[in-house]
């Protein structure tokens, strides 16, 4: 007796194949995300200090440059070159902004600045007080960091090159909607920094 050949039911096979393909894709994505998170976690676990040159581009297109220093946790210095000649320092609960051309000083609470996410404590992707999102495109890894309990802190987007794995720039979005992009160059990691870097300048008292 001749055996009949039967065709597989396409209405069953196609959904199964699609499900397998989707499952495989998500397994790859999950694995890639896990590897990426591991690299980022390792970067921050090993990060104690940073010294680098920077180029800053504001929402309006203004370009500034200077030197930046981090000593984690809690210390920050952004030293702008002329003609801006601004100095931003932090070594506690306040960010001090100084205009050295006109000798003025303004203070803002650290917790109202996007920098609070980065310098109050070293970033941990398992920190419940911080929301994180990953994106990996064309060898550039983006990590978006937001405070879970403080909308005033805005958000910070950190961009890393994949090979070699290094911090390349960050983008600050404040609670007013302004966007500032900072490109990092000539970065030196974990170099010993003088604690004096993080003190504001002392301006002479105005003469009446």
Where are these regions (language model features)?
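An acidic-aromatic
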Residues: 67-117, 180
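Gly/Pro-enriched, hydrophobic low-complexity segments
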Residues: 127-132, 136-207
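Short hydrophobic/aromatic-rich beta-strand segments that constitute the beta-sheet cores
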Residues: 54, 76-80, 95-98, 143, ...
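Bacterial N-terminal signal peptides
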Residues: 15-28
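A short, Trp-centered hydrophobic/proline-enriched beta-strand micro-motif
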Residues: 42-61, 69
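Boundary at the C-terminal end of the N-terminal hydrophobic targeting segment
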Residues: 32-34
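Solvent-exposed strand-loop boundary residues in beta-sheet-rich modules
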Residues: 58-60, 101-103, 176
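N-terminal secretory signal peptides that target proteins for export/translocation
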Residues: 1-13
């Amino acid at each position: 007796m001749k055996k009949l050949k039967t065709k597989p039911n396409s209405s069953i096979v196609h959904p199964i194949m699609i499900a397998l393909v989707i499952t495989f894709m998500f397994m790859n994505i999950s694995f890639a995300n896990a590897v990426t998170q591991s690299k980022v976690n390792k970067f921050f676990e090993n990060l104690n200090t940073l010294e680098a040159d920077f180029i800053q581009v504001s929402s309006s297109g203004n370009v500034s440059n200077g030197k930046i220093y981090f000593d984690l946790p809690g210390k920050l210095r952004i030293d702008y070159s002329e003609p801006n000649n601004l100095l931003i320092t932090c070594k506690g609960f306040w960010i001090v902004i100084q205009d050295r051309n006109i000798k003025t000083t303004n203070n803002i609470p650290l917790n109202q600045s996007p920098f609070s996410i980065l310098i109050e404590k070293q970033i941990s992707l398992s920190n419940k007080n911080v929301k994180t999102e990953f994106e990996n495109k064309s060898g550039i890894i983006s990590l978006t960091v937001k405070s879970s309990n403080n909308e005033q802190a805005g958000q910070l987007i950190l961009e890393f090159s994949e090979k070699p794995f290094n911090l390349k720039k960050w983008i600050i979005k404040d609670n007013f909607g302004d966007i500032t992009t900072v490109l990092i160059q000539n970065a030196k990691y974990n170099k010993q920094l003088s604690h004096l870097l993080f003190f504001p300048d002392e301006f002479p008292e105005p003469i009446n």
